[in-house]
């Protein structure tokens, strides 16, 4: 009697998980007065990843960020064509539709600038201010949110006994983390970062990079950077901009 048993080999299908698309642009063009700054930009940017945008000065990198939160609308002489859609609250939305006011969009799409820009008020009020603008009146909830957000950016232990001090008295790295906290306190789905470490020393820059990596769990990050080493370290996707045109880079 042959005791040999046949063993059937089961081949399991390979499942490739593609990140969901968070931001999509189609034929996007941007003009400042008579100059075209962005040219036919067609992108699909994934959710919960860091997308880095590099390129020479004046190529359109920072302008692209202002298109994503409509900040350019505050500047005279600008115009736009094409389409920008975002997945917000579980639905794809045209961010330039009349049904989505700019203030509502900016609560979902936060922004951190190149130079730290604390408001001329206390550390506590710097974080509480956006909540009050969003009509939050519960003082206890505001207090809890300020504390949890400062902890999120690893600043709480450094400032918990100084909350009444002017935020502008903090060091450069602390100020940038304060600005990150101010952007995060409204729980944005997308965070735009315009060279967030360019004015910081190497130690502070490293701290910000680690923080950005930790934020991928909760939001999508789009970062403009001049530093190739930095984008290689922390980005999932890279684009290089030249003369208003985007080109995908290998990471």
Which residues fall in each region the model found?
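The feature captures the beta-strand-to-loop junction immediately N-terminal to the Walker
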Residues: 54-56
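ABC ATPase NBD Q-loop/coupling interface
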Residues: 83-104, 164
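Conserved ABC ATPase "signature" region
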Residues: 85-90, 94, 140-160, 213
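Conserved ABC ATPase signature
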Residues: 164-170, 174
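Catalytic Walker B motif of ABC-type/P-loop ATPase nucleotide-binding domains
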Residues: 191-194
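Helical segment within the ABC ATPase nucleotide-binding domain
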Residues: 205-217
């Amino acid at each position: 009697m042959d005791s040999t048993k046949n063993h059937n080999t089961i081949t399991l299908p390979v499942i490739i998980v593609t990140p969901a698309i968070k931001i999509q642009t189609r034929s996007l063009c941007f003009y400042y007065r008579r100059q075209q700054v962005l040219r036919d930009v067609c992108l699909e940017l994934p959710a919960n990843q860091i997308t880095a945008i590099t390129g020479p000065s004046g190529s359109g990198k920072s302008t692209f960020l202002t298109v994503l939160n409509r900040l350019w609308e505050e500047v005279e002489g600008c115009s736009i064509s094409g389409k920008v859609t975002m997945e917000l609250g579980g639905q794809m939305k045209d961010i330039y539709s009349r049904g989505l006011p700019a203030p509502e969009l900016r609560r979902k799409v936060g922004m951190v600038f190149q130079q730290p820009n604390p408001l001329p008020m206390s550390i506590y009020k710097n974080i509480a201010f956006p909540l009050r603008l969003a009509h939050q009146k519960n003082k206890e909830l505001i207090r809890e949110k300020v504390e949890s957000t400062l902890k999120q950016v690893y600043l709480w232990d450094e400032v918990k006994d100084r909350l009444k001090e002017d935020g502008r008295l903090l060091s450069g790295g602390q100020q940038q983390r304060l600005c990150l906290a101010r952007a995060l306190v409204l729980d944005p789905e997308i965070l735009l970062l315009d060279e967030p470490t360019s004015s910081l020393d190497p130690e502070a820059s490293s701290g910000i990079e680690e923080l950005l990596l930790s934020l991928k769990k909760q939001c999508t990050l789009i970062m403009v950077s001049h530093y190739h080493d930095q984008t290689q370290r922390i980005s999932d996707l890279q684009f290089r901009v030249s003369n208003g045109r985007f080109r995908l880079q290998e990471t």
